[in-house]
């Protein structure tokens, strides 16, 4: 496996980069907030999936593949899902309509992230499979004075927790309710948030001590992370936008329910994603899904391979904002085209790549180090290093008949070039390009004659 580097990670909780010390090196545990399955995942959703996939790969390399548990949830109960189900399937009973939306969206999400080269997490819990665990935590919070029932809701009392706001570093009097949390008169404090709310007859619901209802957003992750990772685990990840209120409220629920000093030891957050220099939004007309990029020509007039999208993300440090642009994708594609297709075999990753990733996932330095390895004779080490980043170029299988046809056209192009028929030579090159073939012209070092090699564009 090679030398084990000291892993250093930036912790949002402490605002410091420090050495990572797992609770149990035999079972390193990481939780990352996954998708709410009401719509196809957009390019901003892709960033945490890719970032924490690289961390998952690194942890597996350092501690062993069987000694890392990565949980990434599926949020399949949410008012946005209900609204989408009613819009898209008005003729179906609500539960069937919700299932149609969530199953379709979840299937698409899995297909998208697979094309981005992401490993499957160790476990992928769904919120609807963990309702009993949520109810248990809520009962604990009511029992120890951290939650109360009002107007058909169970709410967390933010003033009952002395250090509420520690993650976001926002004083309580400055905290607003935030996304998905309504400010109502029945709350003791404006920042109190919903743990459980009653459901009407046409809304999904589960029986509870407080009546038929459904969970609030934040309690879902507290329940799922505890079930699969324990009261305290090593790393909790997600996007910068989740620090407040979602992660702040997860911490409050979990710590107050279980009497712990922390929920997770390290909190990691990736930066925002812009598209062509502007905030991505449907109103701006620049809302781009992963599916759009992979399978349509809506961005830059062409489809983009998953490995290009992934590398484009990794060319910016995960904590920095990223401007997702056609220029960036083209740059990533040019870089990939220079890299060999190879197999790692028993080779170990190069220390330069490993050290870069061990320094708070410095993928920028890791990509630069990987590019320096793309030299003749380095194929196995290059491949082992590329696997850590999940950017090993794919080897394309070509059938003999197709290869023979390409060889014939390449030979014909060489003949017309000798005759100085450059128009016809360009036509052949363009024809091959349309078939996904990239030509490379050079000279025979002994004869000085023009030679042309070809490869399938990646």
Swiss-Prot record:
Keywords: Aminoacyl-tRNA synthetase, ATP-binding, Cytoplasm, Ligase, Metal-binding, Nucleotide-binding, Protein biosynthesis, Zinc. Belongs to the class-I aminoacyl-tRNA synthetase family. A motif ('HIGH' region) lies at residues 35-45. SUPFAM superfamilies: Anticodon-binding domain of a subclass of class I aminoacyl-tRNA synthetases, Nucleotidylyl transferase. This is Cysteine--tRNA ligase. HAMAP family: Cys_tRNA_synth. CDD domains: CysRS_core. One of its GO terms (molecular function) is zinc ion binding. InterPro entries: Cys-tRNA-ligase, Cys-tRNA/MSH_ligase, CysS_C, Rossmann-like_a/b/a_fold, tRNA-synt_1_cat_dom, tRNAsynth_Ia_anticodon-bd. A motif ('KMSKS' region) lies at residues 279-283. Monomer.
């Amino acid at each position: 496996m090679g030398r084990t580097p000291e892993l250093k990670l930036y912790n949002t909780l402490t605002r410091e980069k420090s050495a990572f010390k797992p609770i149990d090196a035999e079972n390193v545990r990481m939780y990352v907030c996954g998708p709410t399955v009401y719509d196809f995942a957009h390019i901003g959703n892709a960033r945490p999936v890719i970032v924490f996939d690289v961390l998952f790969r690194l942890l597996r390399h350092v501690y062993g593949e069987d000694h890392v548990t990565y949980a990434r949830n599926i949020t399949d109960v949410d008012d946005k899902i209900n609204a989408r189900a009613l819009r898209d399937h008005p003729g179906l009973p609500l539960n069937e309509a919700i299932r149609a939306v969530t199953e379709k969206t979840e299937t698409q999400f899995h297909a998208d992230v697979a094309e981005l080269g992401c490993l499957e997490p160790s476990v992928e819990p769904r919120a609807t499979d963990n309702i009993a665990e949520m109810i248990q935590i809520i009962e604990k919070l009511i029992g120890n004075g951290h939650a109360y029932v009002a107007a058909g809701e169970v709410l967390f009392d933010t003033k009952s927790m002395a250090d509420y706001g520690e993650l976001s570093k926002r004083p309580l009097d400055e905290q607003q309710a935030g996304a998905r949390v309504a400010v109502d008169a029945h709350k003791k404090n404006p920042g109190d948030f919903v743990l459980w709310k009653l459901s009407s007859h046409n809304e999904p619901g589960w029986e509870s001590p407080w009546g038929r209802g459904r969970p609030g957003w934040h309690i879902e992750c507290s329940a799922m992370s505890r079930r699969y990772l324990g009261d305290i685990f090593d790393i909790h990840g997600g996007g910068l936008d989740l620090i407040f209120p979602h992660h702040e409220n997860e911490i409050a629920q979990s710590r107050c329910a279980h009497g712990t000093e922390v929920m997770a030891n390290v909190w990691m957050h990736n930066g925002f994603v812009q598209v062509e220099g502007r905030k991505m939004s449907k109103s701006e007309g620049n809302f781009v899904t992963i599916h759009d990029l992979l399978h349509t020509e809506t961005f830059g007039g062409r489809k983009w391979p998953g490995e290009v999208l992934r590398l484009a993300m990794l060319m910016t440090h995960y904590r920095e904002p990223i401007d997702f642009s056609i220029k960036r994708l083209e740059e990533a594609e040019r870089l990939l085209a220079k890299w060999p297709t190879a197999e790692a075999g028993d080779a170990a990753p190069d220390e330069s790549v490993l050290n870069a990733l061990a320094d708070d996932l410095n993928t920028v330095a890791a990509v630069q180090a990987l590019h320096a390895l793309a030299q003749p004779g380095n194929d196995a080490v290059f491949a082992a290093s590329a696997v850590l980043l999940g950017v090993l170029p794919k080897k394309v299988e070509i059938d003999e008949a197709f290869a023979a046809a390409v060889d014939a056209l390449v030979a014909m192009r060489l003949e017309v070039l000798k005759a100085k028929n450059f128009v016809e030579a360009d036509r052949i090159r363009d024809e091959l390009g349309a078939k996904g073939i990239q030509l490379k012209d050079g000279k025979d070092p002994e004869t000085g004659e023009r030679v042309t090699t070809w490869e399938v564009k990646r």
